Amino acid sequence: MTVERLENGVIVQRNTNEIEISITLDTVHGKLEGSTGVNFFDHLLNTFCHYSGLGLRVSTCESKDGILHHLIEDFGISLGLAFRELFDYTKVRRFGEATVPMNEALVGCYVDLSGRPFFQKNFEFSVEKIEDMPVEGFEEFMCGFVNHARITVHFFKFFGKNDHHISESAMKSFGLAIARALEGSEKKTTKGVID
């Protein structure tokens, strides 16, 4: 994996026996450009970009073994690393939270840019796929992102039956929580450092 810093962004390239990914994460555009080849995953990524205010350009996203699990997980790894490289967690608010309704679904997201990776959600999906994306991809993406961004993320589903609505409500709340966590702050961590 290679990382290249830009003025307002980071390029991450990841090439394994399973996938080839090249992405740019920036603080400017606030939208998704390009495609992962998985339509519903693109929809979730674009939702995250819109609500977080971050820009994501997908230059390359190819599966060498045809297994979507690998592609989605490795995309999360690449995006998480780009996020960690782009931001100094000691110079931002660090904590963020948001709860977002979407029709019958209501999901909250709670974020800490702590340097300590942890992911938890209190819901499971009731179907195997949402559109063209295996539902396990949601958790695989989030775990890849969280572990390499080195952040803590909790999702709490208050209500919801439709898996499309639940996942989109979750991603909207994640984007908003990240945007709030990235707000500037003079308040320092009590420990004095974030590893």
UniProtKB/Swiss-Prot annotation:
Assigned keywords, A-Z: Amino-acid biosynthesis, Cytoplasm, Histidine biosynthesis, Lyase
Primary residence: cytoplasm
GO biological process, one term: L-histidine biosynthetic process
Catalytic reaction list: D-erythro-1-(imidazol-4-yl)glycerol 3-phosphate = 3-(imidazol-4-yl)-2-oxopropyl phosphate + H2O
GO cellular component, one term: cytoplasm
Pathway linked to the protein: Amino-acid biosynthesis; L-histidine biosynthesis; L-histidine from 5-phospho-alpha-D-ribose 1-diphosphate: step 6/9
Pfam families: IGPD
Entry's family note: Belongs to the imidazoleglycerol-phosphate dehydratase family.
Protein name: Imidazoleglycerol-phosphate dehydratase
High-level lineage: Bacteria, Thermotogati, Thermotogota, Thermotogae, Thermotogales
